[in-house]
Amino acid sequence: MTMTSTTTKAMAMAAAVLAAAAVAATNAQTCGKQNDGMICPHNLCCSQFGYCGLGRDYCGTGCQSGACCSSQRCGSQGGGATCSNNQCCSQYGYCGFGSEYCGSGCQNGPCRADIKCGSNANGELCPNNMCCSQWGYCGLGSEFCGNGCQSGACCPEKRCGKQAGGDKCPNNFCCSAGGYCGLGGNYCGSGCQSGGCYKGGDGMAAILANNQSVSFEGIIESVAELV
């Protein structure tokens, strides 16, 4: 086999793999009404456009599910609706996680005690991107992710990078080009300063699943090794 035919074969295989991966990337990232009501993993927000991530671009206006900055309504105050992502519905009809939501009067969801974190637990991070409140407890909703939030899906996002004296994001979140912490293409893509940046950040598509990014760069290299 000639060098030319080998190269052609490698390029053809890479193109086929990339095409398949592009479909996989779309399916992996889409959620909500754009993908049959799919929920994002690890409490990632489903944006109004149906993509998973963290930060105001995903958790702000129009957020469909996950660690949305504005708590969703539920229970008797929300027409009997239950919360997405297995969150608790508080006695006042707001979705979240932690004692304010899952404690006394909780209407539905996994009511349970708080998990300690941050300044209350030697700097421990909360699981599944939950917020660590200013008081050192894990949860979701404005009581945990609002003012004083130490780590996790804080709203608004923490500042980082050159815009914040070189600070890095907690939870290995990405520091966007604009100096905000989050997850998803708007934070981990082009211009990402630190954290789990996409290797192919300059316009190269990536798959977001279980908080890991997998770039097509590695796919091409793997195909090249096979021929």
Curated annotation (Swiss-Prot):
Source species of the chain: Oryza sativa subsp. indica
Glycoprotein recorded as keyword: yes
Disulfide pattern: 31-46, 40-52, 45-59, 63-68, 74-89, 83-95, 88-102, 106-111, 117-132, 126-138, 131-145, 149-154, 160-175, 169-181, 174-188, 192-197
Record's protein name: Lectin
Name of a matching Pfam family: Chitin_bind_1
Residues linked to a glycan: 211
Top-level taxon in the UniProt lineage: Eukaryota
Record-linked Gene3D superfamilies: Endochitinase-like
SUPFAM superfamilies given in the database record: Plant lectins/antimicrobial peptides (SSF57016)
Record bears the keyword ATP-binding: no
InterPro entries membership: Chitin-bd_1 (IPR001002), Chitin-binding_1_CS (IPR018371), Endochitinase-like_sf (IPR036861)
Span of domain Chitin-binding type-1: 29-70, 71-113, 114-156, 157-199
Pyrrolidone carboxylic acid: residues carrying this PTM: 29
UniProt-annotated binding residues for substrate: 38-40, 90-101, 142-143
Function statement: N-acetyl-D-glucosamine binding lectin.
Signal peptide limits: 1-28
Propeptide: 202-227
GO terms, molecular function: carbohydrate binding; chitin binding
Keyword set, alphabetical order: Chitin-binding, Disulfide bond, Glycoprotein, Lectin, Pyrrolidone carboxylic acid, Repeat, Signal
